[in-house]
């Protein structure tokens, strides 16, 4: 019997998920611990780093004490984590304030300050509220008494890993989301930090599969772990999500629909000619990049639909109802800009719209319009990638969009590409587990580990006739942003 396991820990926004995986890729046990989100003012989004650690300890204890783990030995741990979030600590490693998260949009002024010096892109990425550098500038300008005590900055999973090992590192796939890292030469661009008087607060850089220490002996005893559990750096949630979905080769792509939506395209050669708000990041697979587009309110839009119109229906019932409407929702379009939009517009102020409402529209049409609108927004990113010359042989769909055969076929038809669904989907936590398995030497390459662990369950082929019809609706969808940009800005001014 296989007794050795690794733990993959995914620090998300709403929860921490921990899985135990054996050498055959079987998930032996899985636990999840919910997290509190602090949103004290409009545009603010924070979490307490100490609560991440307490939730992780609780989850590991539950997992270790489960019946399924009674004869298992944890040999390694690695991490996946929500990207961009700013954690600042003093010289004792104690957080100086709550972490400012990826979806915090208070720093628009700081983004403009960076643009005034560097233009619209910095280190191959657009300058947007989600990134780490603008968050630093906000703290520096609004909380100088805190900023003056900063010894080092970290990203969320890096702080959590520090709590387990008492060693401080940051790896490439997360560092590239700060605007302070050059993804081409794998170095901090300290001259950028010097421009804004950031100071020497940079953590040491390592690869995603790098060994960074062991769980401290006192913590190992508290958690019920052996004293020799090796810890590996891990990766950003999107890089780990891609690894956990088997998306590691050129011309392979990932569509992930959670609270936000992501389209990620793997590149062996970095492409810098993108004409819009795509991100270019380092993959957790060595010497590999990925381009990424983000829909800020993907699953969030579906949650809003349920809470507002379908409080008593399940998501499955909502999707079945949507499937009963025709392609194009009988002439009803929805833009999922409930929290602004990242790709392609980079606009924190834009708001969503229903366009084309008539007295003939039903709840089924509204449900389908929301599903199609989310998918059109993801298609925006795919269009940009294709214009830059990147082909996609297939897209693996994970998250909420992979739980419905109707939505999977809709993705295939709109994107006009083969869509794959996984046999077992564990998301970024599986990617973290794979990094630990590779780091331990269970496999000679990440590729061989992925091949052993990840299996495809079903493939959806595009319907050309449906795609042609969706293209007509999409051409109208594309025009809505420019037509409503000023209108929604005016409404925000009045409302605020």
From Swiss-Prot:
Lineage, highest ranks first: Bacteria, Bacillati, Bacillota, Bacilli, Bacillales
Query: Taxonomically, which superkingdom?
Result: Bacteria
Biological process terms from the Gene Ontology for this record are: D-xylose metabolic process; xylulose catabolic process
Q: Recorded GO terms, molecular function?
A: ATP binding; D-xylulokinase activity
Name this protein carries in UniProt: Xylulose kinase
Q: Which gene encodes it?
A: xylB
Q: What is its EC number?
A: 2.7.1.17
What does this gene product do? Answer: Catalyzes the phosphorylation of D-xylulose to D-xylulose 5-phosphate.
Could you say which residues bind substrate here? 83-84
Which leading EC class covers this enzyme?
Answer: transferase
Entry-linked HAMAP family: XylB
Looking up PANTHER family in the UniProt record yields: SUGAR KINASE, XYLULOSE KINASE
Say which species the protein is native to: Staphylococcus epidermidis (strain ATCC 12228 / FDA PCI 1200)
What family, per the record? Belongs to the FGGY kinase family.
Site entry (Important for activity), positions: 10
Its catalytic activity?
Answer: D-xylulose + ATP = D-xylulose 5-phosphate + ADP + H(+)
Task: Identify the catalytic residues.
Answer: 237
Q: Which UniProt keywords apply?
A: ATP-binding, Carbohydrate metabolism, Kinase, Nucleotide-binding, Transferase, Xylose metabolism
InterPro entries linked:
ATPase_NBD, Carb_kinase_FGGY, Carb_kinase_FGGY_CS, FGGY_C, FGGY_Carb_Kinase, FGGY_N, Xylulokinase
